[in-house]
From Swiss-Prot:
Record's protein name: Type 1 phosphatases regulator YPI1
GO MF term set: protein phosphatase 1 binding; protein serine/threonine phosphatase inhibitor activity
Biased composition (Polar residues): 14-28
Organism expressing this protein natively: Coccidioides immitis (strain RS) (Valley fever fungus)
Pfam families in the cross-refs: PPI_Ypi1
Biased composition (Acidic residues): 93-110
Length: 169
């Protein structure tokens, strides 16, 4: 059974007429509209060129969190402020630590040891002996692990149970 839909009625429109002798406008329905709206740009207190006013000015607390010279107000990467070599982080200052040295295994994941500006891997330092091999792998290959998917890339799982809901074919 086919249904036909009546055409959509036209949207109501208003026509404004400007009368030069007064500041009153009238609509098609005869309702007077009074008033004038004047829009002005923001007045600047300092003497700046027009090109300087159009540029984005970042606050001092905004960081370049990707190392590419681009500042952003949204954080898309975890930023770790660079520290001096001997300086410790607040996480490793706990009293239950076995070692008093600052470069422990817990600091490896700080982001500093992962990549340099040239995007090449950097050797990481930690406090255990490798027997002089310096991460050579001792001749064995590690099984390749699947990379972790972050929350933005993960596809949500939906219930495919539709029989009891009345939906579906």
């Amino acid at each position: 059974m086919a249904r036909t839909r009546p055409p959509n009625p036209p949207a109501p429109s208003i026509t404004a007429t400007h009368v030069e002798s007064s500041n009153i406008q009238q609509t098609r329905r005869g309702i007077p509209i009074t008033g004038t709206l004047r829009l002005r740009g923001e007045a600047t207190a300092t003497e700046e060129s027009p090109a300087e006013r159009r540029h984005i000015r970042w606050a001092e607390d905004v960081v370049d969190n990707e190392g590419q010279g681009k500042k952003s107000s949204k954080v898309c990467c975890i930023y770790h402020k660079p520290r001096e070599v001997g300086e410790s982080s607040s996480e490793s200052d706990s009293s239950d630590s076995d070692s008093s040295e600052s470069n422990s295994d817990s600091e490896i994941d700080s982001g500093e040891a992962r990549m340099t500006n040239s995007r090449s891997p950097r050797r990481h330092l930690h406090n255990h002996d490798h027997g002089g091999s310096e991460h050579s792998g001792h001749g064995r290959k590690r099984p390749k692990t699947k990379p972790k998917v972050n929350a933005y890339e993960r596809v949500p799982k939906y219930n495919e149970k539709r029989e009891g809901t009345g939906e579906g074919p």
